[in-house]
């Protein structure tokens, strides 16, 4: 009976969009997206705390080491544009000689999630101009553990929790106006 609850009737899972907060965090953001895609939810904040990144950002070898520490196998590849469709997706792609993005799909358009901009679509020609030929396939190993998605702080949840204090705030406001 419990197996029925785990069934998912979608054609593919979605890679969550996780935006980088600093210019040097594109690699960490890509790892957080792929780790979360497989069910181990990580934030850039927790990855930054656990694995320091230089001010220049992450190298491919840094990403491989960090992926290994969160029980993800990885395989760096050098490839041509026509080989993109053979990659295990989602994967990390190196573009513009200094930036990592997550490759989500390869069809008539190439769909990537850029940690600095969000979801983007490129034509084959557009993508060939920025693609450096480097990819990093990532997938869970046998020790990989899924975790619960942590609730993200939401300002409106805070207001809802403070609703019981609303009468007190209104008395204070009235006193402030009167005095």
What is each PLM-predicted segment?
Residues 1-179:
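Membrane-integrated ABC transporters
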């Amino acid at each position: 009976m419990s197996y029925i609850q785990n069934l998912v009737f979608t054609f593919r899972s979605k890679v969550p969009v996780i935006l980088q907060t600093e210019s040097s965090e594109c690699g960490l953001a890509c790892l957080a997206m792929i780790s979360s895609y497989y069910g181990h939810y990580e934030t850039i904040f927790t990855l930054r705390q656990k694995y320091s990144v230089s001010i220049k950002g992450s190298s491919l070898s840094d990403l491989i080491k960090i992926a290994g520490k969160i029980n993800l196998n990885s395989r760096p590849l050098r490839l041509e544009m026509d080989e993109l469709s053979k990659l295990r997706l989602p994967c990390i792609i190196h573009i513009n000689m200094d930036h990592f993005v997550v490759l989500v799909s390869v069809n008539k358009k190439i769909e990537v999630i850029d940690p600095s901009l969000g979801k983007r679509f490129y034509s084959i020609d557009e993508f060939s101009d920025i693609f450096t030929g480097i990819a990093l396939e990532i997938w869970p190993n046998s020790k990989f553990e899924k975790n619960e998605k942590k609730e993200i702080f939401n300002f409106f949840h805070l207001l809802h929790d403070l609703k019981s204090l609303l009468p007190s705030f209104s008395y204070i406001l009235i006193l402030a106006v009167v005095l």
